[in-house]
A protein has these predicted regions:
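Conserved hydrophobic/aromatic beta-strand scaffold that supports enzyme active sites
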Residues: 61, 73-75
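Structural motif
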Residues: 59-60, 80
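Aromatic- and glycine-rich peptidoglycan recognition patches
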Residues: 35, 70, 77-112
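Intrinsically disordered, low-complexity
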Residues: 1-7, 111-112
Length: 112
């Protein structure tokens, strides 16, 4: 995953010049786990098994509602952290307990 850190966010982007959150999950899961995911967040939220926030394990997908009809996805890294493509920060690591993310948490899925 480290090769992606610092990559700028670009809606619809799929390369190191700019990537969005769901494309980042496609790339990371393909490279790290040899697992093919669908391209969009709305498709990804249907994959795997729903799990509760308190049962998160490394590699679980975490979904957020970030606005009316807007969804965001990241991958859990353990110790309350997740890896994602942030609109404001690009590809970064954030904490689930930060108020912004805690209040927007939607659901989690185990796909590996």
């Amino acid at each position: 995953y480290s090769k992606w850190v610092g990559t700028p966010y670009r809606y619809g982007g799929q390369t190191s010049r700019g990537i969005d959150c769901s494309a980042l999950m496609v790339k990371v899961f393909g490279d790290a786990f040899n697992r093919q995911l669908p391209r969009t967040t709305i498709q990804q939220v249907k994959v795997g098994k729903a799990i509760s926030k308190r049962h998160l394990q490394i590699g679980d997908l975490i979904f957020f509602k970030t606005g009316w009809n807007k969804r965001h996805v990241g991958v859990y890294m353990g110790k309350g952290q997740f890896f994602h493509a942030s609109v404001s920060k690009g590809v970064t690591i954030s904490r689930l307990d930060k108020p912004y993310w805690a209040k927007r948490y939607w659901q989690s899925r185990r796909v590996i």
